[in-house]
C-alpha cells in the first residue's frame, strides 16, 4: 500500500511526517 499510495496519494500520514502530530487527523484529511 505504501508504494501504491506513494505514487497516487501524497496526503497520507506516513508521507507527511511533518504533520505527524496531526497524522491521526491526516487520515481524516484524506
Curated annotation (Swiss-Prot):
Biased composition (Gly residues): 19-30
Species this protein is from: Atheris nitschei (Great lakes bush viper)
Region (Disordered) location: 1-30
GO molecular function: peptidase inhibitor activity
Subcellular locations according to the entry: Secreted
Family named by the database record: Belongs to the pHpG family.
Tissue: Expressed by the venom gland.
GO cellular component: extracellular region
Protein name from the UniProt record: Poly-His-poly-Gly peptide 2
Alphabetic keyword roster: Metalloenzyme inhibitor, Metalloprotease inhibitor, Protease inhibitor, Secreted
Broad class of where this protein is predominantly found: secreted
Amino acid at each position: 500500500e505504501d508504494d501504491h499510495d506513494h505514487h497516487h496519494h501524497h496526503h497520507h500520514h506516513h508521507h507527511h511526517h511533518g504533520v505527524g502530530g496531526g497524522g491521526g487527523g491526516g487520515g481524516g484529511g484524506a
